[in-house]
Amino acid sequence: MSKVNKEGAQQTSLLDVLKKKMRQAREEAEAAKDEADEVKRQLEEERKKREDAEAEVAALNRRIVLVEEDLERTEDRLKTATSKLEQATKAADEADRARKSMETRSQQDEERANFLETQVDEAKVIAEDADRKYEEVARKLAMVEADLERAEERAEAGENKIVELEEELRVVGNNLKSLEVSEEKALQREDSYEEQIRTVSSRLKEAETRAEFAERSVQKLQKEVDRLEDELLLEKERVRNLTEEIEQTVQEIQGS
């Protein structure tokens, strides 16, 4: 082979090598570009994921703040509800104690009222009995007064008779003793009537005293019954107010 041919062959071989290297370089450049694009895409995805994550973290932080605020408000409402519940429980306990006390007191008042009513009835019976006795004594007194009046009439008649007898004494001296005996008996009857009047008057005063005492007892017992009835009404009103307050508190708790 000639020198020229050798040089041409060497140049052709070198050109092929250069083309091959250029092709390889282009391929490597394209591969590097593709790799760079992939890396860029991955970086963009990572950036987007990071932004999304940051946005999600921010949203979660805002949500946490809202949840914390809601939790704080819930805790405040819970404290308020707990306080109201404690107050309602205390009020319910007080109302229950008041109810039991009122029931006991009402029972005692009812028993006392029954006892006082019994005493009032007994006092009324005593007063009625005293009235009957007073009427009976008054009737007997009227009878005694009538007897006394008749006795006075008889005494007056006796005195008239004595006058007549005294007039006749001068004529009928033998009848003097008989007339004296008649006069003595008349005086004895008069003394007996006066004693009966004193006895009846004493019994009448006693009956009047008992009647006054019975009337005062009835008035006193009636006042006591009225007072107990007023106290019972006040206790019932207090229990009704406590019950309304408890119901209102429970409604407020349920409304919260």
Swiss-Prot record:
Gene3D superfamilies: 1.20.5.170. Residues 21-52, 75-116 are annotated as: Disordered. Its main location: cytoplasm. It comes from the Eukaryota. Keywords: Actin-binding, Coiled coil, Cytoplasm, Muscle protein. Tropomyosin, in association with the troponin complex, plays a central role in the calcium dependent regulation of muscle contraction. Involved in muscle actin filament organization and muscle arm extension and morphology. Also has a role in male mating behavior by regulating the copulatory spicules. Binds to F-actin. It comes from Caenorhabditis elegans. This is Tropomyosin isoforms c/e. One of its GO terms (cellular component) is striated muscle thin filament.
